[in-house]
Amino acid sequence: MKIARHKVNRLSRLTRIFFGGLVIFLVFWSGWAQQPPSSPLGPLSARTGLLLKDSVIIRLIQASSGDLAFDTVSHLALWHRLQTSESYTRAAEWISQKARDIGLEQVGIERFPADGTIEYFGNTMPPQWKVMKAELWLTSPFSMKLTSYAELPLSLAMHSTSADVEAELVDIGAGIDDKDYTASVKGKIVLTTSNALRIYDRAVAKEGAAGIVSSWSVPDFDSLNRRPADFPDQVGWQRIPGKGVEGPSHFAFGLSARRAQELQSLIRQGKTVRVHAIVEAKLVPGNLEVVSGTIPGSAYPNEEIVVTAHLDHYKPGANDNASGSASILEMARTMRQLIENKEMPPPLRTIRFMWVPEYNGTYAWLSKHLNDPVKRLADLNFDMVGENVVKTNSVISVCYTSDSNPSFLNAVMESILDFVNRFNDDRYPAQTDFYIGSLNGTRNRAAWRMIPFVSGTDHDLFNRLRIGAASLGAWPDDFYHSSEDSPDKVDPTQLHRAVVLGLAAIDTLAYADSEQAQDFAQLSLVYGRQRIAHSEFSASRSLLSATKNGFHEADHLAGNLMAHVFSRERAAISSAVMLARTPKARSDVQRVVSWLDGDEAASRKKVEDIARLRAGELGLTRSPLPLTEADKRAARLIPIWNEGKELFSFEYVQRILAQDSSAQIPKIKAALDEVSQRLRDRGVDELTLYGFQDAAALYVDGKRSIPDIRDALAAEYTSIAVEALELYFRAFEKAGLMKILDK
């Protein structure tokens, strides 16, 4: 019995030890299991070139879907999503419900009045255009329905209002020259190949035409990429004037080139062609509606990464811009899923997703939120991102921030773009873990590129506020702003790649903490050196090609360019300081900035050597360009924005001062047009030139003098006379937007 009791006691002790150890193990295991996932960021990856860990980018690829995004595109393409319209409201409500369903927080639709007179930052907001019915019929020499709003909403020009007119159809060709109106068009409906808006004042307001039928579909700025004959069944998206909710009845219809040619043939045969236009539509007060939702930041909730896409446009508007709207919804869904499944921690910063009416909605939203107690670190914009590039003749690109707003964001975006290209440039890549495709998509190769800053979409406004802002988009697109911008031109694979780029950028920015500030600075240094090398090449080439008469200017501009790009890249690296929260982290960033000092000395020496070589070949002595009296006067002048006016544009200045001859607006416009033409002659594309008239204003920071701004423009674009710039800024001052300090 004693032995038995001893064995029992021993077993009891062993049991207690076992279960005690098990409890301790379970406690530790439970604690380990409940640890939140680690930061997605790490040191620069040798495989991917990203600041994201390899395992994270793989998970982002696998968790996201281009096919789900494509389904969203197909749904949005069912609505004629014009700004302030009832169909836009339905699309906004649908998106907001989807945002709630996937778990975004603070989801809501903000409404801003718009009636054709209300302005935000000097931009007049359009009224609601309410269409009940619109049809265009051929009534002679036979009866046939030519088009209808119900079947093709885009065929009725925006802002057309109620009319019931049966009249003779007369062909006026382009409708621009006097010869097009040798025969009276009063009371008749004119057939034209021009944009209805372009000829409206002449044909309707002056000559008395009852209405317009237009076969136009190719914007002037896209004429290098397509011609009307290339797509004979394409109907272009058009509008006519419609400033307020009251005014005379007027209308315009759009037809395809093929249908218009049929009508022209009847007219040439000498037959009397009559058409019947029936329009029930009116302009009424409406609202701009902005949908937004957030993933709140866990550590720095008052710092935001803003992700934007414009929700509006014509039906179908698949690539422009159901694709961008669908892409950011898929980014939000993927982020919420990974956080909810504890595969990723909550972001340190708040991520705000916004679906907006392009430009106007962002202007309106900023009018309310510009002074919110939050720090907006970046805007990532997605506009026309789903193109099947083979079908649409497109190139996918990411634009740098403007040189007036240098940012580490450029290096972040370029590193992700390089990653996408590297692992998606073959149809059947060897490294499939980094391949981004879709079940129902193509195997088109990725050949994305970085391009100079362009405006034309919503990132432009954040850039003006000196927030790092980049935009992903496709250009050209053969179906842009036409009836053929349909879901069959959208590629789920391309959507998936856009989503992954967005997720990678969002995560890199939203999870960065103070200890990563130096990593961002170093990444900016690497990519900045690449851009500097390109500028060094450009400066050297311009010197070697300089003629005797043009050498001194080329020498000056080459030196100016090198000074500019080093200043830009120092500022881009320095911008990483916004992530630094300790003196050491800030010091680490500035140490990286200093590494450019040696680079600049070496780079300038190489350019100087080439300048001396070329001067010798031409038999010239190098000398600086002499300062003119205008230079000396302007050097004392420093433009400063008046508070809250930074988003006002030169277009507003022109409108406000149109009747003020002392502002010399025609002279300023002529100077800007001359510079734009020189850039075109150099092969600069229209997308880059879009918004150029505001480029000088972007450099206004209260520190730069007018010659400083001239020099910056010369480096980023081309030279402009300092006298023209002084007039330009005087006009801004006269319009109440700036003041000019005379130091």
How would you label these PLM feature ranges?
Residues 71, 334-364, 372, 382:
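Short helix-loop-beta-strand segments that form the rim/entrance of peptidase-like active sites
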Residues 239-242, 252-253, 260-261, 300, ...:
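Metal-dependent peptidase/peptidase-like ectodomains
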Residues 688-743:
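Long, charge-rich, low-complexity alpha-helical segments
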Residues 35-52, 62, 66, 74-186:
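Noncatalytic luminal/extracellular "stalk/propeptide" segments of secretory-pathway proteins
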Residues 148-180, 237-320, 330-346, 350:
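Soluble metallo-hydrolase cores and metallopeptidase-like ectodomains found primarily
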